[in-house]
Curated annotation (Swiss-Prot):
Reactions accelerated catalytically: an S-(2-hydroxyacyl)glutathione + H2O = a 2-hydroxy carboxylate + glutathione + H(+)
Lineage, uppermost ranks: Bacteria, Pseudomonadati, Pseudomonadota, Gammaproteobacteria, Enterobacterales
Gene name of this polypeptide: gloB
Manner of cofactor binding, per the entry note: Binds 2 Zn(2+) ions per subunit.
Family annotation (PANTHER family): HYDROXYACYLGLUTATHIONE HYDROLASE, HYDROXYACYLGLUTATHIONE HYDROLASE GLOB
Binding site for Zn(2+) 1: H53, H55, H110, D127
Family: Belongs to the metallo-beta-lactamase superfamily. Glyoxalase II family.
Matches recorded under NCBIfam families: GSH_gloB (TIGR03413)
Official protein name in the record: Hydroxyacylglutathione hydrolase
Keyword line: Hydrolase, Metal-binding, Zinc
GO molecular function: hydroxyacylglutathione hydrolase activity; metal ion binding
InterPro entries, A to Z: Clx_II_MBL (IPR035680), Glyoxalase_II_hydrolase (IPR050110), HAGH_C (IPR032282), Hydroxyacylglutathione_Hdrlase (IPR017782), Metallo-B-lactamas (IPR001279), RibonucZ/Hydroxyglut_hydro (IPR036866)
Pathway: Secondary metabolite metabolism; methylglyoxal degradation; (R)-lactate from methylglyoxal: step 2/2
Signal peptide from the UniProt entry: none
Length: 250
């Protein structure tokens, strides 16, 4: 299985998996036109669409795509059922496509029913975890988001994160405002800034890298607590809440 992506809208990524037989799967098509053009140009056969959650920049292209390719199966969580989904997925489901198994994990926090799809080594985590950051928390579900990103953190270190937005520089800027002397974050920021200036992307990224530069995956560290003026016994969850609220206002 080969991974590629299309940049759409302002900063979204649509992820595409395809095989040697030119069959493909797309994840979170926020638009239709660019995706259809790509499929036609590559002469791919679209087999399935996977949706992580019900925000328009992730589902906006579904209707037009299935109008063009009516035999496509659309998978998504319960919250996406009005988006032409014909296969509702839930925690623990295993989707068998293109001779591969795709595991479904409930990763709420950004939305109540947000899911992620795991096809080793890739995790398509939508708006749950970003490079250098995490998604906004709606409906005050901070513990849900905390659990979700820590679940992703628990995956094998060689896991490849396929996030849905190019927010990396902004996230690293925030991280440096918290930890201005962190050499790993500063070095990675310079690397990604150069990539972006060359019209390259920062994604996908390994979980191994994220554990080093993503402060939302480091909320148990004494250095972060000290930098934020918190007591040593402040819980990782409390640190996460404070970080996420500060990022909202950054």
């Amino acid at each position: 299985m080969i991974l590629t992506s299309i940049s759409v809208l302002k900063d979204n990524y649509v992820w595409i998996l395809y095989n040697d037989n030119c069959s493909c799967i797309i994840i979170d098509p926020g638009v239709s036109e660019d995706i259809i053009k790509k499929i036609e140009k590559k002469n791919w056969k679209l087999i399935a669409i996977l949706l992580t959650h019900n925000h328009i920049d992730h589902v906006g292209g579904v209707e037009e795509i299935i109008r063009r390719y009516p035999n496509v199966t659309v998978f998504g969580p319960e919250e996406t059922k009005t988006r032409n989904v014909n296969k509702i997925v839930k925690q623990g489901d295993v989707i068998k496509l293109l001779k591969s198994e795709i595991h479904v994990f409930l990763t709420p926090g950004h939305t109540l029913g947000h899911v992620s799809y795991y096809l080793k080594p890739y995790i398509f985590c939508g708006d749950t975890l970003f490079s250098g950051g995490c998604g906004r928390v709606f409906k005050n579900k901070f513990f849900d988001m905390y659990q979700s990103i820590n679940f992703i953190k628990s995956l094998p270190k060689k896991t490849i994160l396929c996030c849905s937005h190019e927010y990396t520089l902004s996230n690293l800027n925030f991280a440096m405002s918290i930890l201005p002397f962190d050499k790993k974050i500063k070095k990675y920021y310079k690397k990604i800034k150069k990539h972006i200036s060359q019209n390259k992307t920062s994604l996908p990224v390994s979980l191994e890298t994220e554990k080093k530069i993503n402060i939302f995956l480091r909320t148990n560290e004494k250095t972060i607590k000290k930098a934020m003026g918190l007591k040593k016994d402040t819980s990782s969850f409390e640190v996460f809440i404070l970080l996420r609220k500060e990022k909202d206002d950054f």
